[in-house]
Amino acid sequence: MIYREEDFLLLSGLQHFKFCRRQWALIHIEQQWAENFRTTDGRLMHRKAHEKGSSERRGDLLILRSLPVFSASLGVSGECDVVEFRQTPDGIALSGQDGLWQPYPVEYKRGKYNERAGDLLQLCGQAMCLEEMLCCTIPKGALYYGEPRRRLPVSFTEELRQKVRNALEEMHELYRRGYTPKVRTSKSCNACSLKELCLPKLMGRSSVAKYLADALEGSP
């Protein structure tokens, strides 16, 4: 299926969707947003990744920052924090550059790796967009986490790619219907920037205070 540009979803929504389908719908369908420490810190982390300019050359390494990407087959568009192109004999040609180059996307994140987060899906989605745009194969990339200050290498396996496709298909269907799903509450709700908007609607105002108190009590 080929999506029209006006039907493209935001690639960054994969992370929201993996964390919580309801959070994704509140942000991307109902257009609601609220800041907390985590979202503010995350924005600052991305700003640092972009602040050195749009491109940089270091020998056989070309670094592009804030690179817009899209995929008509997936129906998404977004922006890569950093894409590193390393000169290699079996790479692809780049306009204005001599030689052949292999793309390697790098996504910057606050904190440290959490397997429940959608970071892997978001990074893999970026790679799939780049593959479609550049007519190439990208086998791996990396997530950079601000707390340990190091990279986590990521292989874009077929299993991970299929998870991206499945998530985007469900996201497109929910968006088409304009439907905000209900979900079971959990301790992770307490870390969500939208809890004050979401929980009163989801649970009824009388039970929200008790839920938050229980969640805080159970936190380490």
Predicted segments with their positions:
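Residue-level signal for alpha-helical context at structural boundaries
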Residues: 32-35, 43, 144, 159, ...
